[in-house]
Amino acid sequence: MDKAQRYLTAGTRENTRKSYRAAIEHFEVTWGGFLPATAEGIVRYLAEYADSLALSTLRQRLAALAQWHVSQGFPDPTKAPHVRQMLKGIRVVHPTRQKQAAPLQLRHLEKAVNWLNSKAADAVESGDYRALMRYRRDAALLLIGFWRGFRSDELARLQVEDTQAEAGIGITFYLPYTKADRDHQGSTFHTPALKKLCPVEAYINWINVAGMTRGPVFRKLDRWGNLSEKGFKSTSLIPLLRRILEEAGIPAQSYSSHSMRRGFATWASANGWDIKGLMSYVGWKDMKSALRYVDASNSFGGLAAFSPGRIDHDDPESSS
């Protein structure tokens, strides 16, 4: 790979490159299409898979085909009016409700963290260092994931050397890039220390027991308690989250890695955060992205039987 190609490749996310390659292969090999394509060919391709693939998947396939044509210097057939009309028709004939992760409710977060802290105390008493590391790590993962609203890939990319935590004050994370930071300018995220369910305390507890000074914040532990040098893969966080919640006695099948992010957004909305403050804190750049995570906050006041953003005693304090 020459220098120019190296930088051109670096300008596109690895996951995007993989998904685009898979989309082009599906068009050429699975369906038998030819590149460069015509708008009529794109329409036939969409018609073939309209009833078997989600509209979001079809849009991703079109994005890949568009990128291929533009990068090769050909006109983009996906922008043709009848291709857009075809997408509209698919949406009408095959209406689907957009799937959303269930928000992790604050009461479930509290129950899981209390269980983890109790198990950590038992591990200290019994001298089980491996178990102590696991419970400290899992508590930090839950609390940082919830209160910062990080995506799974962002949690997986957190580095100890780019994190500063001060007990009773707050914690600051730096990420070289995020999904919203398309120009890779880097972003800094701050969260204050809380009176309870505190991500700062959980992080410090985890770092101290693990003895880490550099490298990924969240890593695998083997059966003997040895800490991996490599960080979690983002895809491993969903089964890990579900395992933690299940072990704490919380039904977890409806939860995904987005549940912590959506849970925080639900809590913040219920506690008076305006949408601009929430967008700034989490890092959303457009309103549409933010609103996908926030449940409508119509208040029924004291008549409401249950509020997902409230627990029975004093809520943790946070600020935007």
Regions found by a protein language model. Name each.
Residues M1-S320:
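Extended, non-catalytic subsegments within catalytic or DNA/protein-binding/adaptor domains
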